[in-house]
Amino acid sequence: SGDSGDGMQLAGNIFSTVSATVGNDISTFPDYPADIRAPQGSLTGVSGFQVHIGANKVFTPGDKCDVLVAMNAAALKTQYKFAKSTACIIIDTDCFQASDLQKAAFKTDNPIEEMGIKQDVIAAPISQMVKDCLAETGMDNKAMLKCRNMFALGLVCWLFNRDLKIAEDFLKEKFAKKPEIAEANIKVIHAGYDYGHNTHASVAHTYKIESKIKTPGVYMDIMGNKATAYGFIAAAEKAGLKLFLGSYPITPATDVLHELSKHKSLGVITVQCEDEISGCATAIGASFAGALAVTTTSGPGTVSYTHLTLPTT
């Protein structure tokens, strides 16, 4: 967990992919802040990604976590309640400065003591170590700090005895058009892994989960938005209609737009609009033209849609 721009969703997705690839069952729950452009370090701007992995069938994302990553003071303040009494907590001490603690409404300069945290805490200067790791890459400070999530991911991969090769392949594919970004992230993820190995960070909380090789072609990694997109395609096919999506990109609804845009060969038409009202308006127009038309929103757009409500007599 961390700020919206800390890349928690990406780190969670990569760890999920790594775990699924080695044969673990997974269930995930991405958690996005309700605020639009919440102030950095604020309590209302915390974003998180929950991953539940196991050797046997996993049915839910789980209630309490064994490992909690808090990239700043606000994340620790809001997410600590989800940590088990035996959990391991990872924090970036560079983001627990006086100003960070003030934003998170801490009253003292020792949040661990103030919250009465008894669990093991891996307190690492993640931000500084990332900058040291990438010092010779020529990247600016802002670009380097965007890799903080990969350091935390590398440390978590060490705790769970995960092979980094799968994570490397994921990053190379995601940043195929920007190989320098892929290499920077790969370098940092190894730095996080090595930090855990060299310092034996929280040896009491290393995990080994039995892996079971899955039969190729039988299983897939799917999230709710992707399943929703497939449902739209199936509904249009059964209705004998073309599928139209008018959408404004806004997290997390953007995933539906991204997925449907891949399936033009199946008669899917997607339009990216400048705002959510436009997205809804194009869908209404497409429905009058005979298409199965849908629009998406992460929530706030629902209010905007009322402006397009047609009066009836």
What residue ranges belong to the model's regions?
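Active-site cofactor/cluster-binding pocket
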Residues: S1-A239, V303
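Aromatic/hydrophobic pocket-lining residues that form π-stacking "cages" and hydrophobic walls in ligand
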Residues: F15, T282-A283, T306
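Flexible glycine/proline-rich, aromatic-decorated loop/lid segments
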Residues: G45-S47, Q272, G285, L308
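Short, glycine/acidic-enriched loop or turn micro-motifs at the edges of active sites
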Residues: C95, I250, T312
